[in-house]
Amino acid sequence: TQAYLNAVRIPWVDMIGHSGSPAFPFDEEAVVREAARCGKVIEVNESSSKSRPGSEDACLRIISLCKQYHTRICVDSDAHFCSQVGDFPKSSRLLDELQFPKELVINADIRQLDDYLEERQRQKPKCTA
């Protein structure tokens, strides 16, 4: 938990990925709440349930918490083969079932992604070294 909390507080970190693995339990609510406070994104990874058995329940809890705390997410296929790029039917179904707000999905469309990237660029401290 502390490692995730420390990570979301680092100005150069934009997103927490692969957070639904049951092999690495953490205080999901504390991390999602802090990610929202710090303007960070939580990845929703389509491959989690395939590559990390047991992660679907954790991912569902994390997505629900993201909705509750208005934490932005990024949905991705985590494709390991070219035909899987952009393919995330399980994640889409989960988001629909939870009525997850589209405005919290930073890559729902190109405008939202551009807006997020511009916002993050303004927030990051400039290197002066």
Which functions belong to the PLM regions below?
Residues 5, 10-13, 23-129:
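Charged catalytic cores and adjacent phosphate/nucleic-acid-binding surfaces used
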Residues 18:
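Acidic/histidine-rich, metal-coordinating catalytic segments
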